Design a protein with these regions (language model features):
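N-terminal auxiliary segments of SAM/dcSAM-dependent transferases
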Residues: 1-25
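A short glycine-rich, Lys/Arg-flanked "PGG" loop and its adjoining helix->strand segment in the class I
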Residues: 147-159
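Hydrophobic beta-strand segment of the Class I
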Residues: 34, 134-135
Length: 247
């Protein structure tokens, strides 16, 4: 598997823990404020991005779904409401995020439709050809080994099943890029520190976005791993992108 520059980006540079361990600990630490900060820092735009990503599955109408890096289950809940599959399983390496997600699911009475499990995207504990569709929102950037995670998701997809990835990207227009850079470098870490007491998590957000292979580069990785019918859509002047591929 190819190693990428972003694979080495970690939240806590002085830590001796692996990226996977650091990411799990980071999300455990910010789990209580994660949803609030998502809405606040994106001015609610992230909800629209998630809806557009899930809409890529409208034609497929999947019955059995996997939401990788499910976090607090925003996408799993939204996918159930939009697509009405028989079952959604969400996996994540952060118990703190999963705890928040389970409370949301229970409050909505969806515990019979959505199940959350502690699970590793690079070693998914399901058989080959299990899921009709897989979603992963703002998660692949946190994989310790990007290609390994993408290959694992392909393994558990059924033939004809579809992967939908939603991930941050970098604006191309110079003026927008300047505003974006200022916001990510100056505003986001300060707000993260103020509300979650964890500035490092939001500095990591900026660095991991900058070094992540995006756009045609990411599609090329999907192609290399033999996903079919690959494409991407740029959202909000390039701040976010949707990537899709079929097994």
């Amino acid at each position: 598997m190819t190693a990428f520059e972003h694979d080495k980006v970690v939240p806590y540079k002085e830590s001796g823990l692996s990226k996977k361990q650091q990411v799990a600990g980071m999300f455990d630490d910010i789990s209580g404020k994660y949803d609030f900060l998502n809405r606040f820092l994106s001015a609610g735009t992230d909800l629209g991005w998630r809806k557009k990503a899930i809409a890529q599955l409208n034609i497929l109408k999947p019955k059995i779904m996997l939401d990788v890096a499910t976090g607090t289950a925003d996408v799993a809940i939204m996918a159930y409401n939009m697509l009405k599959p028989d079952k959604i399983t969400g996996i994540d390496i952060s118990d703190g995020m999963l705890e928040v997600g389970r409370k949301k699911i229970n409050k909505l009475g969806l515990q019979g439709n959505i199940e959350l499990l502690n699970g590793d995207s690079e070693a998914i504990s399901f058989n080959d050809n299990t899921f009709d569709a897989i979603t992963v929102a703002f998660g692949v950037r946190n994989f310790q080994h990007l290609e390994t995670g993408l290959q694992e998701m392909k393994r558990v997809l059924k033939p004809g099943g579809k992967l939908v990835v939603l991930e941050f990207s970098k604006p191309r227009m110079p003026f927008v890029r300047s505003l974006y850079d200022f916001y990510m470098k100056m505003v986001t870490p300060r707000m993260g520190k103020l509300f979650s007491r964890n500035r490092d998590a939001y500095k990591y957000l900026d660095e991991s976005i900058r070094k992540f292979p995006e756009g045609k580069q990411f599609v090329a990785i999907l192609d290399k791993l033999e996903y079919k019918s690959t494409y991407f859509k740029s959202l909000s002047l390039g701040i976010c992108s949707i990537y899709c591929g079929t097994k």
